[in-house]
UniProtKB/Swiss-Prot annotation:
This is 3,4-dihydroxy-2-butanone 4-phosphate synthase. D-ribulose 5-phosphate binds at residues 37-38, 42, 150-154, 174. It comes from Aeromonas hydrophila subsp. hydrophila (strain ATCC 7966 / DSM 30187 / BCRC 13018 / CCUG 14551 / JCM 1027 / KCTC 2358 / NCIMB 9240 / NCTC 8049). The gene is ribB. Mg(2+) 1 binds at residue 38. Mg(2+) 2 binds at residues 38, 153. Catalyzes the conversion of D-ribulose 5-phosphate to formate and 3,4-dihydroxy-2-butanone 4-phosphate.
């Protein structure tokens, strides 16, 4: 990962701290994964505070596949089956069936409808009957152990929410360029500058979690 591009956002620990502060304030963050992995960047918001306007930005600036990152516990609570029984995707991305709020939505595809669906899924007393399947929101099941177990955007999202003291649910979508191609690190940095969003990497988050583990040992 080209650290010189990220230097304006501080060192790895400072970048994570800035991201946590932004999430607590209801703002978005940009997370890049390893260059030898997907080499992509995701726009991420806290599920509990995401607004219609932020969802509209995500739909406009990203790939359109809006994903709700959930813990395994929440997936079980909602009784969401996995999208496929035998996952053959290269990085084992753990999609469940897609969802829609059972009440309060129209077609389910608008920014407001997707926010309604997300709020239904993350409510404290959420039940399987609160959701219809299929829908326009794509839940992802995070692996237990977070980025120390799997260095994916799903795990990074849940880790960030937990470290920020928020509900362990986040919304992500892959940032794209105007021509529809995937945004890389230079594009993330430019987008972060334009929208005052912190930029960090999954490697930063791994280092941060390892440091916390060492301090508590």
């Amino acid at each position: 990962m080209n650290q010189s591009l990220l230097s304006e956002f501080g060192d790895p620990i400072a970048r994570v701290e800035a991201a946590l502060a932004a999430l607590r304030a209801g703002r978005g963050v940009l997370v890049a994964d390893d260059e030898d992995r997907e080499n992509e960047g995701d726009l991420i918001f806290a599920a509990e505070s995401m607004t219609n306007e932020q969802m509209a930005m995500m739909i406009r600036e990203c790939s359109g596949i809006v994903c709700l990152c959930l813990t395994d516990e929440r997936v079980r609570q909602l009784e969401l089956p996995m999208m496929v029984e035998a996952n053959s995707s290269h990085y084992q991305t753990a999609f469940t069936v897609t969802i829609e709020a059972a009440q309060g939505v129209t077609t389910g595809v608008s920014a407001a409808d997707r926010i309604t669906t997300i709020r239904a899924a993350i409510a404290d007393g959420a039940r399987p009957s609160d959701l219809h399947r299929p829908g326009h929101v794509f839940p992802l099941r995070a692996r237990t152990g977070g980025v120390l177990t799997r260095r994916g955007h799903t795990e990074a999202t849940v880790d960030l929410m937990q470290l920020a003291g928020l509900k362990p649910f986040g919304v992500l979508c892959e940032l794209t360029k105007e021509d529809g191609s995937m945004a890389r690190l230079p594009d993330l940095v430019a987008f972060g500058r334009q929208h005052q969003m912190p930029v960090l990497t999954i490697e930063d988050l791994v280092q941060y979690r390892q440091l916390l583990s060492e301090r508590s040992a």
